[in-house]
Amino acid sequence: MHSQRIAPYKTLILNELRYYPLELDLTPFNALIFTSKNAVFSLLETLKDSPKLKMLQNIPAYALSEPTAKTLQDHHFKVAFIGEKAHGKEFVQEILPLLEKKSVLYLRAKEIASSLDAILLEHGINFQQAVVYENKLKHLTLSEQNALKPKEKSVLIFTAISHAKAFLRYFEFLENYTAISIGNTTALYLQKQGIQSYSAKKPSLEACLELALSLRIKEC
């Protein structure tokens, strides 16, 4: 949901999603891990005519955040747990004791920011990973880049490391830009690029938009 009190704002799309079909036999699994809504959308798209989708919907799902959990619930998945912190490192610590003696399937992107997989392995969790989507950089011509470049004094919201990488691939981060990160890993990535960012109270787009509004009010 977008805040209706914030105007004008634009969505700058620099990546495109590529979905990959799930090829695994689902019989062994009795727990699913979702850290992104995109993994859910990939399953809905690639398995819409397959009995595998119904099987997945009946396996308890462990969701990183409220938005991911809501997407799962809206599409009839069985949500067993929702992360309280909604950040990768904290989430894996929350679910470790819940996943003991379970056979886990982690549905993920091709590139991930957290070390969730390594931590599960380190703690002896019986799990497999399936790459079900990828964030691909869109090709932009020079004229498209010029047309899309944010104006000076813009507030920029970065909802993933992949979005920050894409932005910096095409644009310079001006000194008078203000950056907002949706989560800790995105903020850390920006910091490594020499960009300080504000972090929203919750890792959601709505919280980021509310923060953007409060920053604008302070400037006035």
Regions found by a protein language model. Give the residues of each.
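Signature of uroporphyrinogen-III synthase
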Residues: 1-220
